[in-house]
Amino acid sequence: MKSFYHYLMKYRHPKPKDEISHFANAAYEDHSFPKASTDYHELSVYLELNGDYLSSMTTFDEAFEQYDVEVKKK
């Protein structure tokens, strides 16, 4: 199964137009991001402690919900 990080990278963009693209760009720059994780709780805890680049955890929640629908539910 594709990790959340791998899924999120499809939203990277040199000129981000939305919060998820900003998140993807920042996660790419975050060398400690749990790149292999598929677990909501693990990612959420990491971002709460280290995700100062997120304007709101809602952005993560929305991205993870999309990931859950598109990848995990297959």
Swiss-Prot record:
Q: Where, by residue number, does the polypeptide cross the bilayer?
A: none
Q: Can you list the disulfide-bonded cysteine pairs?
A: none
Please name the NCBIfam families in this protein's record: PRK13672.1
Q: What is this protein called?
A: UPF0346 protein BPUM_1890
Q: Which InterPro entries match?
A: UPF0346 (IPR010673), YozE_SAM-like (IPR023089), YozE_SAM-like_sf (IPR036806)
Give the similarity note.
Belongs to the UPF0346 family.
Provide the taxonomic classification: Bacteria, Bacillati, Bacillota, Bacilli, Bacillales
Q: Which domain of life is it from?
A: Bacteria
Origin species: Bacillus pumilus (strain SAFR-032)
